[in-house]
Amino acid sequence: MKLKTLTLTHYRNYETAELNFSDEVNIFIGINAQGKTNLLEAIYCLAMAKSHRTSNDKELIGWGHEFSHIEGMLSYKHGTMPLSLSISKKGKKAKVNYLEQKRLTEYIGHMNVVLFAPEDLNLVKGSPQIRRRFIDMEIGQISAVYLNDLSNYQRLLKQKNHLLKQMKLSNSNDMTMLEVINEQFAQYAVKLTLRRKMFIEQLETLAIPIHTGITKDKERLSLRYNASLNYELAEQEMFEETIRILNANMGKEIERTQSLYGPHRDDLSFKINDIDVQTYGSQGQQRTTALSIKLAEIELINQEIGEYPILLLDDVLSELDDDRQTHLLTTIQHKVQTFVTTTSVEGIEHETINKAKLFNVSEGQISTN
């Protein structure tokens, strides 16, 4: 898939902007704090209906305005599709083919993106919450069912935690309501855990040869989904085991006033040659691991939906050494539409620059060469 055009209205520091893109590489050039990353963020928002930089949607609305609007024309193998996202203080409205979607979960997945930014090193060395968010966002792009299950799970998790606090405050011994919530909670916990397990296995299969290529066969990468539930069981057995664990630990959860078991407690670990990369890996190994995961993600989305996603590279090409940059650019060449932000084209392969469409960004104004 390719993003042919992007139109912004009152988006961050852009009063208005209309851009036409190359199907190959598009590079936004400018000094810091001019709005380069805002453009990548707008593309990400158009795909995911949320920012990767802030959870406060009000920040996306230009100063002094009541709303912001992002619009894009997407092309696929079989045609084109207009997408739009309007953001106001009242909420968000998303349209596909000019038709408003009832839920954002119905909108997400029409446009697929993979973002690689300097902070993605935190995917390897950061908190488990970062890795869970990564898993949820990436599966959500290719599975509307997963997004729906995740939404239901998060709703039940919130209800359960609220009930646990009430039970501790009232010193209640009546477990009836908690048992009812646990049964519903377990159903979605099992669904999410099994889907995540499958995703991690698929990702590992694709990431291993990529990582081996980057490291010139010196290192072997492995991924493991560390779940609080036993995913080696059949689905029905797993559900029954989960119910047993939840009900056996009700007293403990009431005392702690939080849900101690379920996908919201899970993590993803990375090993190189059987050594934990998060704890013992060098920065170079952590960066290579993150790059391998991102490139594997591109291939996984293509396998699942039959289209390559759009790649967003936020100030990372200059941070990659020659070998990693070459591997990245070779992998995506002629297959993946790519958007790059950089303060300078120095350090980027000449071949890439020569075939790219360049956009100069300064104080919210954009010009092309």
Curated annotation (Swiss-Prot):
The entry's localization annotation reads: Cytoplasm
- State if ATP-binding is listed as a keyword: yes
Q: Name one GO cellular component term.
A: cytoplasm
Q: InterPro entries this protein is in? A: DNA-binding_RecF, DNA-binding_RecF_CS, P-loop_NTPase, RecF/RecN/SMC_N, RecF_2
Chief location of this protein? cytoplasm
Write out the residues that bind ATP: 30-37
Q: Could you give a GO molecular-function term held by this entry?
A: ATP binding
The UniProt entry, under CDD domains, shows:
ABC_RecF
| GO biological process assignments | DNA replication; DNA synthesis involved in DNA repair; double-strand break repair; SOS response
Say which domain of life the source belongs to: Bacteria
What keywords appear on the UniProt entry?
Answer: ATP-binding, Cytoplasm, DNA damage, DNA repair, DNA replication, DNA-binding, Nucleotide-binding, SOS response
- The answer, when asked if NAD is one of the entry's keywords, is no
Its job: The RecF protein is involved in DNA metabolism; it is required for DNA replication and normal SOS inducibility. RecF binds preferentially to single-stranded, linear DNA. It also seems to bind ATP.
Family as reported in the entry's similarity comment: Belongs to the RecF family.
NCBIfam families associated with the record: recf
Q: What is the protein name for this chain?
A: DNA replication and repair protein RecF
Species annotation: Macrococcus caseolyticus (strain JCSC5402)
